[in-house]
């Protein structure tokens, strides 16, 4: 195994190195078994290898010493070189300081010399300038302009500078001595001003922005500079309104000018603001007037729609213009422009809105009643009418015929949707067009119109008509349409409440009008709920009355006391069948007409009255043994019917009634035991006794003794 330095590079493991050495030595490993193992040969190999390692170690050591000597030599040379560089750097730094001091000295001298030259040159330049102006002034005084600056059209810029200065000087001269020359200078001033504006106009038409900038810079010191801006604004608008959308045209125009105006004028914000002012006060104001004045008196609906649309689009344009630099208070500037256009229309907006909403709502309602061939009648309230209504509710006395509505509820979702849609649009216009301080008050006025026409003129009228159409409780085969009124009224209440929350609340949420609106809404709903409750109560009375008619007409005394006890089929009676059919139909109608807890409340009330009716009805008859079985079958059927109510209390009442009916058939000896049973134990003894008294064998079997 050759020994090299590479074998000892990291990672080096001595055990592995020995293992490899042994494995390569013949007779040193485990190959060939124990017989092949030669320890002498292995020892010899180890001795030789150790000698090789010693030789290699000496060789490496000599190499390390040589490298260390070389490193020390190079370190000394490098240190010497660094010292030389430090000395050289110190010399250079000294030279730099000397040069810096010399430069500062020279600069001071130059500045001093410059100040001296300027002190001499400035008066000289002023003198030269004054001399030139005197020369030009003499030409005006003589009446003949000979200087090249006035005769050469290419030097209009220099001429403008001269005439502008002469114009200022002429203003200081006395009029009586220099009136003629002042007049000539003023005339030349005006001519040059016109030439410059004409040059600016021509450059604008050619699209030469650089020339426009030069001329504008010259005109900046002339009185006609504002006229130059006016010309620029006028020419910018030529051909700018080619589309059908004036607002989009105006936005594009302002965007184009905004990109260009900074390259032409030194005061771009003022120029752009003046352009926008021109667009609003001339173009937009004229357009708005044409659109609105045409329909202001003849068509309120179109007027309001146009006003809302134009105002919205104008404010939308204003929002786009807010992106431009128009000076410090651009918000106020744009608001004033919008106000100047619309102020005459916004001052009386809410009066137009209220007037239109009233007439439109009245028309929607009248159109509906006309489609039904219905002449809206005045529903009496107060005094005699209220007294009649109370007596009608609490007795069965006929106090005049009820109104026959022929099944018509006089409620229309289409009418409601139309009224709500008109009001929604009115709220949107109110939000956009009202002054923030007037917004809650205006929104409240719109809400009162909605209450008047939707809640009072439509819903309340339908409820009153529905109440008047409910027959008395003793009417036979009465058609009960009030539940249809209830169903539609509930749907309309939900729509009304949704609009209140979605469209009115955001407009009044932070104002005192909120509590006023909530109170008005509460009063309206309470008033209508009271009428609904009254109508439902009277409808339930009619239902019970109809059941009474069925029972009176169909139930015979022989049903429960048959002549032939042996020839009786044990099933429910015909009266029971018809009552159950009627009740199931009414229960289904109630479930379809109401929602939530209202269904349970009404069904519980109907169930309690139904139970009372059957209880009192059963008390009218005498029962034989077989008749008692029939009564139990009837009550069992009534109980099945009561299950459809899904009201635990009603079911419990019929369970108890069913248990009471068992008293009609139980053997006399077991009567006391049954009375103390789980379902009857809590009942009053008189109730139990009253049922037992209905038995045909009450006297013969001496059943009274069980209750003595």
UniProtKB/Swiss-Prot annotation:
It is found in: Cytoplasm; Midbody. The modification N-acetylalanine is found at residue 2. Residues 40-101 form a coiled coil. Keywords: Acetylation, Coiled coil, Cytoplasm, Exocytosis, Phosphoprotein, Protein transport, Transport. The modification Phosphothreonine is found at residues 122, 395, 405. Its main location: cytoplasm. GO terms for biological process: epithelial cell apoptotic process; establishment of planar polarity; membrane fission; mitotic cytokinesis; non-motile cilium assembly; protein localization to plasma membrane; protein transport; vesicle docking involved in exocytosis. The modification Phosphoserine is found at residue 412. GO terms for molecular function: small GTPase binding. The keyword NAD does not apply. GO terms for cellular component: cytosol; exocyst; midbody. Pfam families: Sec10_HB, Sec10_N. InterPro entries: Sec10-like, Sec10_HB, Sec10_N. Signal peptide: none annotated. Belongs to the SEC10 family. Component of the exocyst complex involved in the docking of exocytic vesicles with fusion sites on the plasma membrane. The exocyst complex is composed of EXOC1, EXOC2, EXOC3, EXOC4, EXOC5, EXOC6, EXOC7 and EXOC8. Interacts with EXOC3L1. This is Exocyst complex component 5.
């Amino acid at each position: 195994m050759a020994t090299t330095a590479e074998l000892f590079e990291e990672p080096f493991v001595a055990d592995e190195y020995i293992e490899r050495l042994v494995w390569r030595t013949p007779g040193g490993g485990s190959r060939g078994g124990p017989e092949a193992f030669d320890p002498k040969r292995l020892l010899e190999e180890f001795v030789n290898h150790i000698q090789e390692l010693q030789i290699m170690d000496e060789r490496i050591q000599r190499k390390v010493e040589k490298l260390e000597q070389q490193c020390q030599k190079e370190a000394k040379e490098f240190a010497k070189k660094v010292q030389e560089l430090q000395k050289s750097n110190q010399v250079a730094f000294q030279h730099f300081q000397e040069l810096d001091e010399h430069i500062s000295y020279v600069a001071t001298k130059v500045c001093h010399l410059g100040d001296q030259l300027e002190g001499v040159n400035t008066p000289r330049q002023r003198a030269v300038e004054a001399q030139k102006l005197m020369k030009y002034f003499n030409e005006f005084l003589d009446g003949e302009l000979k200087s090249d600056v006035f005769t050469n059209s290419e030097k209009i810029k220099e001429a403008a500078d001269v005439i502008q200065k002469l114009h200022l000087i002429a203003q200081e001269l006395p009029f009586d001595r220099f009136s003629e020359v002042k007049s000539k200078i003023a005339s030349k001033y005006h001519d040059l001003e016109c030439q410059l504006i004409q040059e600016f106009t021509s450059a604008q038409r050619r699209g030469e922005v650089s020339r426009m900038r030069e001329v504008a810079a010259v005109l900046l010191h002339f009185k006609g500079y504002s006229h130059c801006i006016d010309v620029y604004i006028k020419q910018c608008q030529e051909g700018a309104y080619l589309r059908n959308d004036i607002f989009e045209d105006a936005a594009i125009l302002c965007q184009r000018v905004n990109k260009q105006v900074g390259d032409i004028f030194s005061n771009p914000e003022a120029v752009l603001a003046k352009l926008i002012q021109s667009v609003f006060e001339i173009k937009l104001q004229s357009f708005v007037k044409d659109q609105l004045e045409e329909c202001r008196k003849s068509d309120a609906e179109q007027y309001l729609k146009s006003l809302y649309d134009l105002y919205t689009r104008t404010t939308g344009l204003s929002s786009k213009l807010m992106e431009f630099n128009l000076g410090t208070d651009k918000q106020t500037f744009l608001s004033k422009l919008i106000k100047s256009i619309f102020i005459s229309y916004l001052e009386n907006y809410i009066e137009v809105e209220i007037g239109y909403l009233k007439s439109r709502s009245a028309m929607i309602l009248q159109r509906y009643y006309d489609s039904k061939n219905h002449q809206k009648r005045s529903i009496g309230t107060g005094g005699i009418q209220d007294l009649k209504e109370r007596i009608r509710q609490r007795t069965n006395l006929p106090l005049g015929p009820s109104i026959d509505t022929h099944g018509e509820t006089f409620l229309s979702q289409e009418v409601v949707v139309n009224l709500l849609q008109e009001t929604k649009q009115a709220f949107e216009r109110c939000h956009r067009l009202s002054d923030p301080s007037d917004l809650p008050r205006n929104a409240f006025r719109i809400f009162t119109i909605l209450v008047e026409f939707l809640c009072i003129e439509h819903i309340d009228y339908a409820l009153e008509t529905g109440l008047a159409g409910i027959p008395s409780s003793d009417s036979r085969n009465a058609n009960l349409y009030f539940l249809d009124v209830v169903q539609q009224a509930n749907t309309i209440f939900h729509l009304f409440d949704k609009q209140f929350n979605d469209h009115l609340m955001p407009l009044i949420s932070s104002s005192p009008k909120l509590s006023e609106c909530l109170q008005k809404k509460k009063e309206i709903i309470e008033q209508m709920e009271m009428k609904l409750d009254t109508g439902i109560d009277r409808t339930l009375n009619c239902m019970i009355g109809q059941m009474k008619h069925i029972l009176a007409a169909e139930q015979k005394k022989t049903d429960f006391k048959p002549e032939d006890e042996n020839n009786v089929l044990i099933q429910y009676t015909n009266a029971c069948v018809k009552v159950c059919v009627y009740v199931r139909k009414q229960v289904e109608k109630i479930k379809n007409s109401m929602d939530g807890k209202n269904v349970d409340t009404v069904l519980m009330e109907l169930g309690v009255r139904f139970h009372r009716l059957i209880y009192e009805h059963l008390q009218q008859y005498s029962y034989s043994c077989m008749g008692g079985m029939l009564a139990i079958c009837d009550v069992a059927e009534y109980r099945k019917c009561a299950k459809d109510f899904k009201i635990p209390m009603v079911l419990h009442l019929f369970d108890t009634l069913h248990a009471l009916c068992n008293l009609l058939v139980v053997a006399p000896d077991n009567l006391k035991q049954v009375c103390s049973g789980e379902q009857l134990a809590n009942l009053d003894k008189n109730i139990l006794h009253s049922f037992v008294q209905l038995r045909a064998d009450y006297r013969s079997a001496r059943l009274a003794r069980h209750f003595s």
